[in-house]
Amino acid sequence: MIVDFLSRDVGEENFGALIESYIIHNALRDKVLQMKNISLFCPNFYEEINFVEDGVEVFLNNKNILKSKLLLACDGRFSRLRDKFQIHTTTKNYEQIAIVFNIKHQKPHENIAWEKFLPGGPLAILPLKNQHHSSIVWIAPKLDSQAIIELDQENFMHQLHKKTENCVGEIEIISEKFSYPLIMVAAKKFYHEKMLLVGDAACGVHPIAGQGLNLGLESIKILQELIKQYFLSGLEINSQILIENYNKKAQKSARKMVIATDVLNSLFESQSLAIGLARDLGLGLVNRLPKLKKFFIKNAGGF
């Protein structure tokens, strides 16, 4: 069964953009270097962090001491800052591995992203800027993943062609393959003293819906709006009320995404005939009911 989501269904020219991470990193770094009110301390690292009455002090290995109203922990799903201050987490190991690489292909992708839900796990074909280049995210059971990665080129390509079902024609791999385990990690609270968890440090979800970066950006948006609101009202941007408001709003946003991605993965991973029939019925309804389809598009795309 094929379910298609089109941007015109919600009156938009497109859903958004698929951008390789190194491009985003380089653009952000260039922007930071242009900002006169931002100082970059890299590759320095912290040796000690103290919370004081009016904020936080960070002692760096180069003997600099940074003082701030707030400290943002943006150090990823396996955050050392989160662990340092003993913020407990809920975790779920999906016993799956994501294998990621770029391909060159015969047919133009026409800016269409495909996600194929197949026995053993989904495979996503994500269009890049070049019409004949795409990124592959191949999700496989942990038990099978090493055998897949270690396949010789001929057998790996044979398996890949079977999974893509010729939707982009002949394929050539044009990058290194890398893999990572799929583990959901959600902090039980998104703060400690004057430190806030942001992005994957707060919550990292299953990539099945491609919403990990968007969830991180949403936490930044929530914090930015709260800081602006409190600053314009003449209130301290590190007040306990702001911190608790951020925790409440960001956790609510993250909780919805954790549930959605977890349920979606379970539905397509299940071998149960009853669940399979219910899943196919649900997908059929999405295709036949425009309002239901719009609901999914708007929630995924942030429209």
Language-model region placement:
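Conserved N-terminal helical subregion
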Residues: M1-K84, K92-I97
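Short glycine/proline- and charge-enriched loop/turn segments
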Residues: D4-G11, I139-P141, T261-L264
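Short, solvent-exposed loop/helix junctions and linker helices
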Residues: A17-Y22, E150, L217, S272
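A general structural signal for well-ordered alpha-helical segments in protein cores
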Residues: S21-H25, R29, Q96, V100, ...
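Structural motif
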Residues: V52, P119, L128, Y191-H192
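Conserved FAD-binding catalytic core of PHBH/FMO-like flavoproteins
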Residues: N64, L70-E170, S175-K177
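FAD/FMN-dependent oxidoreductases across multiple families
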Residues: Q146-F231, I237-Q240
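C-terminal helical "tail/cap" subdomain of flavin- and related membrane-associated enzymes
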Residues: E225-F303
